[in-house]
Amino acid sequence: MSIYLFKFEFKNYFIIKTKSELLIDNSKSSSSLKINVDLTMHRIPCYILNMDISDFTGAHTSNVKGTLTKTSLDANGKVLSEDKSALGQKHEDKFTTEDVIKAFNESQGCRLTGSFSVMRLPGNFHVASHTFAPIIRQFRERGENIHFNLTHTIHHISFEDEKDVSLIKEKFNEGIMTPMDGFYLVDDTQGSLLNYYINIIPTEYQDIDNKIYQAFQFTYKQKKVDSGRMIPTIFFRYDISPMKMKYTKYYPGHFDGLINICAIFGGMFTIAGITDSILLKIF
């Protein structure tokens, strides 16, 4: 048994361990936050779909720019040829009312992919059609049945540099970097507001070679409410924690290893002494 424990301790000495700490985030970080999104709305066409953002200060931006693109999909989720446009451009000028009605009748969808930056403040980004409210009102006045089906798939959401996120996931097992990836929700009711509440936690990863990676992990919860008179919308409401998680890779220290080995031998001699005393009393 002692030999086994000695071998285990000796082998354990060469195993890289990870220490976690919860600290106050007093780092001088950037004033902006990059958000990476890949989202499919399965039953709302690209013609009347936008990504909007607003923050704690009340600032609101419609039809955000960045690198976001919209790709039209057919009812089976296949890409419609040559139908791709950047958000922030005058895509809304490139269609007719007949195009929109046809897209709804064909159950077309839309995939939004790319990145954009927001102020590093509590806020939200939302997938919505209220920018096109006058057009939607016109359709309804004509008696056209515009059905807002919010069924969607979140292929990917992350924060800051995508390359760093991928690298950290390869090097570390700790943290929750992309918990929403692959999430699918069916919602074919016409009067819903879907809210995702996201708690973002600044995180620092220190590799065994002391190289440091900055990232953001996050958790979320989802809640559905009645939209009332609003156009059905999906909100991603985020808040940034004042605390920071730190993960540090390290080898066990020489002193700790020596103490454990001494404890093994000490235990071995103690057991041997007790056994010897028992045998002397018996015999």
Regions found by a protein language model. Give the residues of each.
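Helix-loop boundary elements of multi-pass alpha-helical membrane proteins
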Residues: 1, 13-19, 278-283
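Hydrophobic membrane-insertion alpha-helices, especially the h-region
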Residues: 1-7
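Eukaryotic beta-rich interaction modules
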Residues: 5, 15-18, 96-99
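Amphipathic alpha-helical interaction motifs in eukaryotic regulatory proteins
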Residues: 7, 11, 38, 42, ...
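Alpha-helical transmembrane signal-anchor/signal-peptide segments
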Residues: 9-33
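Membrane-proximal extracellular juxtamembrane segment immediately upstream
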Residues: 215-283
